[in-house]
Amino acid sequence: MAGLGHPAAFGRATHAVVRALPESLGQHALRSAKGEEVDVARAERQHQLYVGVLGSKLGLQVVELPADESLPDCVFVEDVAVVCEETALITRPGAPSRRKEVDMMKEALEKLQLNIVEMKDENATLDGGDVLFTGREFFVGLSKRTNQRGAEILADTFKDYAVSTVPVADGLHLKSFCSMAGPNLIAIGSSESAQKALKIMQQMSDHRYDKLTVPDDIAANCIYLNIPNKGHVLLHRTPEEYPESAKVYEKLKDHMLIPVSMSELEKVDGLLTCCSVLINKKVDS
């Protein structure tokens, strides 16, 4: 039935596509606000630890794409593809400087034999950071980077699921203040704009979600995985970075909790979900 989806399989993943970060990120990555300079060497170490958690610790097959110095934002792979089941939508990122990032991602997803759909419409923009998939439906943030036409193409691509749009007034993306922390659990920041967006999502949906409210909007961006033999796994920001939000995550007794630092990439709007595209490939029987 449309919109119902397959919640039982939510969070399952066999592969993660990531991309190394270029030196050019330090000076040339897009950022919503001027601030501290990125320590690129430290950003690289944090990124390597993140990739290590997905691969070595959790056993996903990691496909690591090389950095491209002409694409300073290319480490943020989430924005260039939305993958659901065996279908991958190659997006048309809202920032023109990021459009060429899709090429290498498309190639990688073709090698994984996914069904590829490309967003060709020049009136459409969509960043994957604006796409929240709950396992039952999609919410798409309408932001500076994602427009209505982009949301319509996503809805056409994933016809089995309901798609609702949510205005994003503050913050770069919808997932700058929310994400899924479990099969039925939305992690949400405490700001007025985050709470307003949650209210809209609740009104749009036929389903009642549980919510996990954290004090810091940025810390509401986490990665939930359902890993065989490990169960519920949650990557969240460290207590050193966001102590009060970490305390909220620590109350999730059914989850294997893995704190991960992202302080350097955060300076250029990078959050945990931004740095991977997670894929659940069916095992050939």
From Swiss-Prot:
Keywords: Acetylation, Hydrolase, Metal-binding, S-nitrosylation, Zinc. It holds the Pfam family DDAH_eukar. The modification S-nitrosocysteine is found at residues 222, 274. The modification N-acetylalanine is found at residue 2. The active site is at 173 (proton donor), 274 (nucleophile). Optimum pH is 8.5. Detected in brain, liver, kidney and pancreas, and at low levels in skeletal muscle. One of its GO terms (molecular function) is amino acid binding. This is N(G),N(G)-dimethylarginine dimethylaminohydrolase 1. It comes from Homo sapiens.
